[in-house]
From Swiss-Prot:
Gene Ontology MF term list: protein-cysteine S-palmitoyltransferase activity
Pfam families listed in its UniProt record: DHHC
Protein's recorded name: Palmitoyltransferase PFA5
Location (main, coarse): membrane
Reactions performed catalytically: L-cysteinyl-[protein] + hexadecanoyl-CoA = S-hexadecanoyl-L-cysteinyl-[protein] + CoA
Species this protein is from: Schizosaccharomyces pombe (strain 972 / ATCC 24843) (Fission yeast)
Membrane-traversing stretches: 22-42, 57-77, 161-181, 192-212
Family classification: Belongs to the DHHC palmitoyltransferase family. PFA5 subfamily.
Alphabetized UniProt keyword annotations: Acyltransferase, Lipoprotein, Membrane, Palmitate, Transferase, Transmembrane, Transmembrane helix
PROSITE patterns xref list: DHHC
PTM comment: Autopalmitoylated.
């Protein structure tokens, strides 16, 4: 039985990894063609060049500048994710679970979490990826469109890609729609313009939904994996406060608790960094080591109260 499950898992992993090569190649080809059509045919031919006595030099140049900024940052963020190294687990020391760590995620029996497949210790917010078949720090999800596990090492770049990609798609969709309404009758539209219009509309819809979802996750300091059934999810924690206790106590959270929610501002900075230029530029990854995460003070107080009541 286990052999069949392992074989299915290997097939699933192989399929996802194949899609993780096909999708990025298709995305780069499609967006590259869209960039050429938008710049050469829409911005230059239909705005900057004189055509039927009409010329909008300023508008064409402004479109090109803003498009290069947003699309350039989108491409750069995408490549940062594409060529990032996943933050694999495996070197977590057992001292992570010592008495100097007052609270950490544990198994239902109170013991430190260990992956049954990788045979490695799992620090807080780490999970096993079914595609990479490795345990990853702050695992979010595997994204076939970038062919990578979105995790601690690239979560910031992934969010920036969604934001800049959505901004560029909006600019292309709106400006193309305006130019079509001014220049062409719908029956005489070039096929290239139709492709750009449809592709940018898909980008706005898809990236917009993803951006809204991940903005909500970011502001609550949860990820896609933790967001599954989060209103009913119960965590198990090993709790120890040396000033009040002699040994660790197993404490369970209440359904819907958000252990790492420290408010919108701190949650944002925990992923995007402390400085405004890090929010804009996809240069530095999220602060921290991917193992230690600050808990909500109110949540720690709740866990302490529960632990003391159980220990008394």
């Amino acid at each position: 039985m286990s052999t069949n499950l392992e074989e299915k898992q290997r097939r699933f992993s192989k399929l996802q990894k194949t899609l993780g090569v096909v999708f990025p190649a298709a995305i780069l080809l499609s967006t590259g063609y869209t960039v050429w059509v938008f710049i050469a045919l829409i911005c230059v031919d239909s705005n900057i060049k004189i055509r039927n006595g009409y010329r909008n030099l300023g508008g064409g140049i402004v479109l090109i500048i803003f498009f290069f900024i947003t699309s350039g940052l989108a491409y750069f963020s995408y490549f940062r994710v594409l060529f990032s190294s996943p933050s694999f687990c495996g070197n977590t020391l057992y001292t992570y679970y010592g008495f100097d760590n007052p609270i950490f995620l544990c198994g239902p029996n109170g013991a430190p979490r260990m992956c049954g497949t990788c045979k490695c210790w799992l620090p807080d917010r780490s999970h096993h990826s079914r595609v990479s078949m490795r345990c990853i720090r702050k695992f979010d999800h595997y994204c076939s469109f970038v062919g990578k596990d979105v995790c601690f090492s690239n979560q910031k770049f992934f969010y920036q890609f969604l934001f800049y990609g959505f901004s560029a798609a909006c600019m292309v969709l709106i400006s193309t729609a305006i130019m079509i309404s001014r220049t062409y009758h719908y029956r005489s539209l070039p096929g290239t313009w139709i492709f750009v219009l449809v592709f940018s509309a898909f980008g706005v819809l898809f990236l917009g939904v993803m951006l809204v979802r991940h903005t909500g996750y970011l502001l609550l300091n949860i990820n896609s994996h933790e967001a599954k059934n989060w209103k009913t999810r119960i965590y198990s924690f090993s709790v120890f406060f040396p000033e009040h206790m002699d040994s660790r106590v197993l404490v369970q959270s209440d359904p819907g608790d958000l252990p790492w929610d420290r408010g919108y501002s701190e949650n944002w900075r925990a992923v995007m960094g402390d400085h405004w230029y890090n929010w804009i530029l996809p240069l530095r990854r999220s602060p921290g080591d991917g193992e230690h995460f600050l808990y909500s003070p109110s949540f720690v107080s709740k866990m302490q109260s529960k632990a003391l009541s159980m220990n008394s």
